[in-house]
């Protein structure tokens, strides 16, 4: 008998913060405001399960909303790389 793999939506897991791909126009504005090049942001691999789930491609910028016990909600950005 063939075994079925169990699937679940990783984005619904309680430990995974909200991720979203930033539109190109907004990404350009964010990069300009931060005064960095996209590749200077922390990296997120395109093969990361969450990157795959949200459809992030190399060159995209991903916004992540994290909950912090000391700072409340924190927004961080990641640059998607292909390796």
Curated annotation (Swiss-Prot):
It catalyses: RNA(n) + a ribonucleoside 5'-triphosphate = RNA(n+1) + diphosphate. GO terms for cellular component: cytoplasm; DNA-directed RNA polymerase complex. SUPFAM superfamilies: RPB5-like RNA polymerase subunit (SSF55287). GO terms for biological process: transcription by RNA polymerase II; transcription elongation by RNA polymerase I; tRNA transcription by RNA polymerase III. It is an enzyme of class 2 (transferase). Disulfide bonds: none annotated. Keywords: Cytoplasm, DNA-directed RNA polymerase, Nucleotidyltransferase, Transcription, Transferase. Transmembrane segments: none annotated. GO terms for molecular function: DNA binding; DNA-directed RNA polymerase activity. It is found in: Cytoplasm. Its EC number is 2.7.7.6. Part of the RNA polymerase complex. Belongs to the archaeal Rpo5/eukaryotic RPB5 RNA polymerase subunit family. DNA-dependent RNA polymerase (RNAP) catalyzes the transcription of DNA into RNA using the four ribonucleoside triphosphates as substrates. This is DNA-directed RNA polymerase subunit Rpo5. The gene is rpo5.
């Amino acid at each position: 008998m063939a075994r079925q793999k169990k699937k679940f939506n990783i984005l619904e897991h309680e430990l995974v913060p909200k991720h979203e791909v930033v539109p190109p126009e907004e990404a350009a504005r964010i990069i300009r405001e931060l005064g960095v090049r996209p590749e200077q942001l922390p990296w997120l691999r395109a093969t990361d399960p969450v990157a795959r789930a949200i459809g992030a491609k190399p060159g995209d910028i991903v916004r992540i909303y994290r909950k912090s016990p000391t700072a409340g909600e924190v927004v961080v950005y990641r640059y998607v790389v292909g390796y």
